[in-house]
Amino acid sequence: MENLLAATNNSVKYMERRKFITTTLKASTALTLMNVPAMVKAAGILNSDLTIQNIIDLILKEIPEAPFKETVDTIKSGNAANKVTGIVTTMFATVDVIREAIKLKANFIIAHEPTFYNHLDDVKWVENNKVVAQKQELLAKNNITVWRFHDYWHTYKPDGIFYGVIKKLDWQNYLRPDKGITLPATTLKNIILHLKSKLGIAHVRVIGDLSKTCKKIALMPGAAGGNIQVSIAEKFTPDLLIVGELQEWETAEYIRDAGLLGNNISLIVLGHTESEEP
């Protein structure tokens, strides 16, 4: 019996196929990376002839205007024509995740972020890269196909990553139509404690007075970049900007100076993976 798998950066969790499908079907209206088997079941083609390309095509049917002409969501390793023996979903297709997939006889890894250390997965990004070559060999030797699921997932309505984080934080009722968040008034410290508890984060980075009251929140998982982060801060004037990752000399210094100039804005940096993995 095949396994359908859900992998994190540090571990792989798995369930027997039928149990997994039953569980995910209950949440099929809120499409997540874990819902791939739910879509397969719904399409009525769950059988031994299912190929990797079949899985990809099913996912793309759920994405507005897919397939895109330009996207990083491409095959990074392997052959999409291969029959599926098992599926791993993960933030990063790390060597640990690949080895777990091998042990579990899963030949298809769906990763949200790059496999070869740069946004375009250009394996010639650094010439004669020994680590890239070793990773390629590990994947090829075990006939594992890696496909990135990034642009499509962020294009899904609502954005799959953003919705997942909002749901994990129990902030659905505070979400505004413009994607801003209006919380009951609370302190920056209390929000930090809530984030750490709900997301399982040991440490966050903060700029701001921990006793300051916050209501209006801008949540930006991942690494949108300094220009977009600062633009959101300027446009929506939130009390608190929560981001996944940033350039320290861009957004962080902007927030620091904004506060020193009397503007009521604080910053929390969660970490890229921590902000998107839920």
Predicted regions mapped to residue ranges:
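Active-site catalytic microenvironments in core metabolic enzymes, especially phosphate/sugar-handling
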Residues: 16-278
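N-terminal secretory signal peptides
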Residues: 1-19
